[in-house]
Amino acid sequence: LPKTAWPPTWAAACPSARHHIHVEFYIIEDDKVGRLVREALAVKAREGVSVRLVYDDVGCWNVKNRFFKQMEAEGIQVAAFLPVRFPKFTSKVDFRNHRKIVVIDGIIGYVGGMNLAERYFYQVDKNQPVWRDTHVRIMGNAVGGLQRAFLSDWYVAAGQTITDQVYYPREEECRKIMACDREPYVSRNALIQIVTSIPTAPWPDIMQGMILALLRARQYCYLQSPYFMPTERMLFALQTAALAGVDVRLMIPERTDKRFLTWASRSFLHDVIRAGVR
């Protein structure tokens, strides 16, 4: 989605919600974007729609508590992910939730890298470059993967288990809603797999999935990431795919928000370019 269109597009999708709206972000700031979202959610909460919001406690450290209290006053259920309080310093400070998810009625989903803050949509500080990130809108059965991720985090943050079938609509209902959708789309028959991972998982699911996809690719594999610091196994998979004739393309920023990460990313480029990665 174009970054300038995403907030109103997301807000425009809220009125269509009939049963629930689930929102989860690492950063939600008390600025124009944050207040726009808060009002959109409050309208639906007043209509009786179940609205749940998870924010990361460390990601929102600079946000006054009253911002979220105002949400609760409007009927929005709010939970902080693994709060960290000082002077009691715990290991939870490094166990953060960077997911950026929106689920509407279990049928419409938004996922990507954009947090809820002005700087993600337009230039706030003339001395800082414009932030460029990606967020996508999906519909259909794949939204169930986002729903499971949110409800798992809701259990951790709010201590509430939610497993009702209403949060996972039947395929027929999804198709009915999709048939009436008028938003621009890339494909109505795309295959989407939602993969999640946590530090305590026995296996690195996301990395293993990417390596498997690279090694099974036959035509092309396109990757986009703000930082490029692959593990040895990931680097080997990229090189192997490119050397096997697969069209492997990597897109990274010329400059990131952290200078040392920019240089760290570039240190790996020679190894993949030498193998034929573009």
Model-identified regions with their sequence ranges:
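Charged, low-complexity intrinsically disordered terminal segments
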Residues: 1-278
